[in-house]
C-alpha cells in the first residue's frame, strides 16, 4: 500500500503531527499502522502512528504523554485522532528486545512511511 492511498484528511493530520513532533523530538521515521494502513478503518478509528526516535531509549510513559499532548492539538485542528507510539531506534532495529516484538514486526511489515 502507498501513502497516496490515504485519505487527504488523514494525510494532512499526520503531516501536522510530524511538524509538531519535529519541534520537540529527534525523529528518525514515522509510520501509519493499524486499521488505517490496512484500509479496514471505521468511522471511529484513530490514526495509529509509530514514531521512531533517535538517541538513547527514554522513558516511555513520559514520552507517550508528551506525544499525546501534540496529538490532541492536531485533533482540535483537524478532527483526526492520532494515537502515537514512541519507539526508539535501537528497539526498532532489534524488535526482539522490545516488550511486544510482534507489534514492531507488524508495523515493519504493514506500516506506511509518513
Task: Tell where the protein language model's regions lie, with residue ranges.
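Catalytic core of pol beta-like nucleotidyltransferases
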Residues: 1-28, 37-43, 54-114
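Short beta-strand->loop micro-motif that forms the acidic, two-metal-ion catalytic signature
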Residues: 47-52
